Swiss-Prot record:
This is Tricalbin-1. It comes from Saccharomyces cerevisiae (strain ATCC 204508 / S288c) (Baker's yeast). It is a multi-pass membrane protein. GO terms for cellular component: cell periphery; cortical endoplasmic reticulum; endoplasmic reticulum; endoplasmic reticulum membrane; mitochondrion; plasma membrane. Ca(2+) 1 binds at residues 1008, 1014, 1064, 1066.
Length: 1186
């Protein structure tokens, strides 16, 4: 669109012109086409894209004048000198020397002058003088008034100066003149940039805002300045004797324009007041409206609630002690000679002040205040601060109203915030002493709004009658979150009409916390919380260029909870409606979105589980296709966990769709955070920000090689998988080296039966590590694969399905008995809701199999879900860790348990590769980061298969023993993975104990002068410098026979290489290496003995024949642990390796899973006892009895 000619010529810009460059884009250049313009970060790309399509005819208009310099026409020559600033504003006039001082200069003198001028004009007219004679009266009156008014303004300035000079009566207010002086100096410098930013943002929004009527073809700010005079802080008062974590302050703030009277033209160009000119183009006519000389004065009270963690301020309460005094000049048609002052309308200013008091009163005026939750605002979620649990017990002594219609009282309670009902109890029939015993959960946005509890009488054909109300102050819940057996009086006409007994509990929203290194602390994976669903927009509902009118109905678990407004357009329809709800069971919560046209006919619909909606928002896949490809709808979902104490629902596990295998090979060029030395890096895998597994750390390196596999369970294809590199810290928290999100969308493929397929991606991928506010540095090389889970029903879902089938039969019977003509609309809507809920649940469970436990146990690979319901620990402040198979680090860890009794449970999962050989270990530790070999308080170890058998159908108690004893109540679920076998690298046959039988050698190289050697062998694993095992020495021979045997630990048989050094023993000097050999350990068979003849290569030249070694190997598979115990030292970490192997004849210490032979009582309560096990667990040979 061409730039509009407003008929006003902009003045020449000064050399210091304001630059409108935001994020590399000049916002004041003429608007470009959609293809040329890149979206601003302040507006979504969708909004920017639609700004130029057919439905958005407005363009972003350029402002004519911005900033005080452009508004005032200031140029460099107008800079005030010292003489200009000292110019006398009370310059005398001719009449000052003639008229006595007592006859002019006060307000009543001005009244007298106008009175005399009026009388003189009347006299001239009465005596038939000509019109010209009135000119002399006007001149004389004007001169007298100018002289008197000028003196009067001078006297006012002197009075103000006197007020500043005289010492005030003592008070406890303080001034902030240092801040005012700072603003006076820098405000004229900052104001042009601030005004420019306001204009850019406002004009951009007004060009894309659909709420503006279509007949307004353009709307923009044409001129804007905040003036050269900044706001002032007039007074500050800090209250004493408040709590240590509470700060209360009074602030007086004012904003007053300059008095431009008696100033010279040069001074006026330097003292510019506030001005805003907004122009609207309506039917081709440009209409300007200007607002200038804005003045206000406010007195506010601010309360800060402090806390220890960042941002250190928990809440801020703002209260205006009175309605602010404000004034302004508003004119229609701008500053032209035809302008019309809007406030000249009689009574308009009074009306504005009254309306301000009416609408500000319930929010900002005493006793109310506006509460801001700072952590919530910083998180950007804009959700409620928590959930309020209301347990209504009973009411006593309700009194009837005087109405003659009250034959019986059927009371129920309604809970309200700001006259909006948020929850209701059931109705109790015909009683004045109702008992409800009902628990309700409501969203709480602020502690400052009182909770209104109204008791109503339910009436069939009349409106329900209010019997009484309670206004309950919730401020006490901030410090005391649980309040039992509260009693409050219902009031009617300020008289008690009954008493209510109830309980209140507040559960706060759990927010993410940023750590000093920029990383975000993990939130617990809870099943309860707050969900906010925003229906933003929709598209493709009709053919191109066809105008569509549509709205959306949102159903939560088959109940209609939101109906958006109607939107009409030819392209994208925008609704931007949201619904926030308390979620008691996230995994079972589902939303149905139905798009209907203007006539109420359905266009399309989609059913999404809450988990899927959350995952879509995590990976920015918010556009959801409707059924039968009838369009798309954009849904954004916000989720915050809340730890509700409602039993196992809060920690219930969501069934997975499969497992992703992440093979983490290595990292290169990592960031070194150490001032001295080098980092000790490891890698974590996170799912939606929650840690699900990690590698071992590699000591002192920037280029670690891990070659470790981590499996993570996923519940939808839209979950966010993240690889994060960390540096080990023994004293403080581990530090982040960067992270990146893994693209796994290509792994999820379905067959013709709509079931997920196994996908193995053998191509190596490289991801660059990114840190907040730092340049990317370092890469990780990894591989990914996907193994689908068998879709099976959980025990709870089987029970739910049985209930659904029973309910369906009951509804079918009711349907056959219903008379369509006699049924009311309410009853029909209720029946339709129940029927739709049954159909949705049937559809949700229709694609899953029902398998009993014996059938499930036929699958050897699967996802093991562990839910800890409650328990008892030996002490407070401990953590419960779970280890599986060869995990050196805990697969999942409980939150810190503040007391000995475990009240709040948790859940976790792990992929079991071989159920019949798997081992599970639970440990209670003082530090959540302790690994498998570090000290614990108590532990228990048992076969995973037995754990499934004993805890699948019902929870069982697990006993842990050691320095102390503990009990945990567990519930187990088993979800088979639909694959024949996982990669050999991940199985138990890839790790274990390698027994080396060094038998003999032939034709070794002579090293001594006598033509012989004193040979022995040294064995090394891969490139390790420490010897894993060495043989005895056989002296003076080239054909030794050792017949020696030793056992070493192998963590990766298929990829490890055994290096051999043939050594010559010397009594007087260091031993010499006379040859080397290598054996890939994948040549060693898992079963039986492997005989190998290994050629030796000499050191003098490549390929030199150094003889032949005759060796034999036997391998015993078992799960090994490659972690080491960390010791704290000054400035560094010293590690004691436990997985490097030992000399011949010794036993592997700490290498295998720990024994449970020390446990003398039953692992499961009331289920018997465990037999003793060997220290080195031999898979497949032990039996566990219950």
């Amino acid at each position: 669109m061409a730039k509009e000619d407003t008929g006003v010529t902009a003045p020449k810009k000064p050399e210091t012109a304001q630059v409108a460059n935001i994020n590399g884009i000049d916002k004041l250049e003429p608007p470009k086409t959609k293809e040329e313009t890149e979206s601003s970060k302040s507006v979504s790309s969708e909004k920017a894209a639609h700004a130029s399509d057919e439905s958005f005819k407005r363009s972003i208009h350029e402002a004519s004048y911005v900033g005080w310099k452009q508004i005032g026409g200031w140029e460099d020559k107008d800079e005030l000198t010292l003489d200009d600033e000292l110019m006398d504003m009370t310059r005398e006039t001719f009449l000052d020397n003639i008229i006595p001082d007592s006859l002019y200069g006060d307000w009543y003198h001005s009244v007298a002058i106008f009175f005399i001028g009026g009388v003189a004009s009347f006299a001239l007219g009465h005596y038939k003088f000509s019109m010209g004679s009135a000119f002399f009266v006007i001149v004389i009156t004007s001169l007298l008034y100018r002289t008197s008014a000028k003196k009067y303004r001078g006297s006012i300035r002197e009075l103000v100066q006197k007020e500043f000079t005289v010492q005030k009566v003592e008070n406890d207010y303080e001034s902030l003149e240092w801040l005012n002086a700072f603003l006076d100096k820098y405000w004229p410098i900052l104001e042009p940039s601030v005004s420019q930013l306001i204009v850019q943002q406002a004009n951009e929004q007004m060009a894309t805002n659909e709420a503006i009527p279509k007949f307004i073809t353009q709307l923009w700010i044409d001129e804007l300045t905040l003036g050269v005079k900044p706001p002032r802080v007039d007074l500050v008062k800090t209250f004493q004797n408040t709590a240590s974590d509470v700060v209360v302050m009074d602030w007086g703030i004012s904003f007053t324009p300059h008095d431009l009277c008696d100033m010279s033209a040069k001074q006026v160009r330097n003292y510019v007041n506030e001005l805003a000119v907004v122009k609207a183009k309506i039917f081709g006519i440009t209409i300007p409206v200007s607002v200038s000389d804005i003045a206000f004065k406010a007195h506010a009270r601010v309360k800060f609630k402090l806390m220890t963690p960042f941002p250190h301020v928990e809440t801020v309460n703002i209260q205006l002690l009175k309605v602010p005094d404000f004034d302004f000049v508003a004119t229609l048609f701008g500053r032209s000679i035809f302008n019309w002052e809007i406030l000249a309308i009689p009574g308009l200013m009074t009306l504005i002040q009254k309306m301000a008091k009416k609408y500000m009163g319930p929010i900002l005026l005493p006793p109310f205040s506006l509460q801001l939750n700072i952590p919530q605002l910083l998180s950007g979620s804009n959700l409620s601060i928590g959930i309020l649990e209301i347990t209504v017990k009973n009411a006593k002594g309700l009194k009837r109203t005087s109405s003659i219609l009250n034959e019986s009282i059927d009371p129920y309670l309604s809970f309200e915030f700001n006259d909006i009902s948020i929850a209701k109890t059931r109705t109790v029939r015909d009683t004045l002493n109702p008992v409800w015993d009902e628990t309700l959960y409501v969203l709480l946005n602020s502690f400052t709004d009182p909770l209104t509890i109204s008791v109503y009488d339910k009436r069939a054909k009349l409106k329900d009658k209010v019997l009484g109300r309670i206004q309950y102050n919730l401020n006490t819940l901030h410090d005391k979150t649980t309040q039992r057996n509260l009693k409050a009086q219902f009031l009617r006409n300020s008289k008690p009409v009954g008493e209510l007994t109830f309980d209140l509990r507040f559960f706060p929203t759990l927010e993410e916390k940023k750590l000093p290194d920029g990383s975000v602390e993990e939130l617990p994976d809870l099943n309860t919380g707050i969900a906010k669903v925003v229906v933003e927009e929709g598209s493709r509902f009709a053919e191109e260029e066809q105008k569509v009118t549509a709205y959306v109905e949102v159903y939560l678990n088959a109940k209609l909870v939101l109906t958006t407004g109607k939107a009409t357009d030819t392209g994208t329809l925008k609704w931007n409606s949201d619904y926030e709800a308390v979620i008691a069971d996230r995994r079972k919560t589902r939303y149905k979105f139905v798009v209907k046209d203007g006539k109420g006919e359905e266009i399309g619909s989609t059913i999404q589980t809450l988990n899927d909606l959350i995952d879509r928002s995590q990976v920015n896949k918010n556009l959801i296709p409707l059924k039968n490809q009838k369009g798309d709808i954009k849904i954004t979902t916000y989720w915050r966990p809340v730890r509700l104490e409602i039993g196992s629902n809060s920690v219930a596990y969501t069934p997975p769709i499969g497992a992703i295998r992440v093979f983490i090979e290595k990292a290169n060029d990592l960031r070194n955070l150490e001032k001295f030395g080098t980092i000790d890096p490891y890698c974590k895998v996170l799912v939606n920000g929650l840690s699900k597994g990690r590698t071992d750390f590699k000591s002192q390196t920037l280029n670690p090689v891990w070659n470790q596999v981590i499996y993570v369970a996923v519940t939808s294809p839209n979950q966010r998988i993240t690889l994060q590199c960390m540096d080990v810290e023994t004293v403080n928290k581990d530090r982040s080296l960067g992270e990146f999100n893994v693209n796994v969308q290509d792994l999820f493929k379905k067959d013709e039966n709509d079931k997920y397929e196994e996908t193995i991606d053998e191509k190596a991928k490289v991801g660059r590590l990114v840190m907040p506010k730092k340049k990317p540095k370092g890469t990780i090389t990894y591989y990914t694969s996907f193994y689908p889970a068998l879709p099976v029903l959980t025990l709870e879902e089987i029970q739910d399905l049985d209930k659904v089938n029973k309910k369906k039969k009951a509804l079918e019977l009711r349907k056959s008995a219903i008379d369509e003509k006699k049924i009311s609309k309410e009853d029909k809507a209720k029946f339709d809701q129940e029927w739709n809920e049954v159909k949705e649940l049937e559809d949700m469970y229709s694609n899953r199999q029902k398998l009993d436990l014996p059938e499930l146990l036929q699958y050897n690979q699967g996802v093991l879900a562990v839910t800890v319901l409650n328990g008892e620990l030996p002490d407070s402040g401990l953590y419960v860790q779970a280890f599986f198979d060869d995990n050196g680090h805990p697969r999942f860890v409980s939150p810190r348990i503040p007391s000995r009794i475990v009240k709040n449970g948790w859940s976790g999962d792990v992929i079991i590769k071989e159920l019949d050989k798997s081992i599970t270990t639970f440990r209670v530790a003082k530090n959540k980061n302790y690994n498998r070999v570090e000290k614990c308080v108590c532990e228990v170890e048992l076969p995973t298969q037995e754990l499934v058998k004993n805890c699948y159908y019902k929870p069982s108690i697990l006993h842990l023993s050691g320095e102390g004893s503990a009990k945990l109540m567990l519930q187990i679920s088993w979800f088979p993975i639909d694959t024949k076998q996982l990669p050999a690298n991940d199985l138990i046959t890839n790790s274990g104990d390698l027994t080396i039988m060094s038998r003999s050698a032939e034709n070794l190289i002579a090293s001594d002068l006598n033509g012989y050697s004193d040979p022995y062998l040294k064995y090394y694993i891969n490139n390790e410098e420490d010897c894993a095992y060495k043989t005895k020495v056989v002296k003076k021979t080239l054909n030794p026979k050792w017949n020696d045997e030793g056992t070493i630990q192998i963590n990766n048989r298929l990829n490890d290489v055994l290096r051999i050094k043939v050594m010559d023993w010397d009594s007087t000097s260091a031993d010499d290496t006379i040859g080397t050999a290598e054996i890939p350990l994948n040549k060693v068979k898992v079963e039986g003995t492997t005989e190998l003849d290994v050629p030796v290569e000499g050191l003098e030249n490549a390929g030199q024949d150094g003889g032949m070694l005759h060796l034999a190997f036997s391998f015993k598979p078992r799960y090994t642990i490659s972690v080491s115990k960390r010791e704290k030292k000054v400035g560094d970490i010293a590690s004691k390796g436990l997985g490097t192997g030992l000399k011949a004849g010794t036993t592997v210490i700490g290498g295998g899973v720990g024994a449970i032979g020390k446990i003398k009582k039953g692992v499961f309560g009331g289920l018997g006892s465990l037999t003793n096990h060997k220290k080195n667990h031999e898979m497949g040979e032990e039996e566990t009895k219950f």
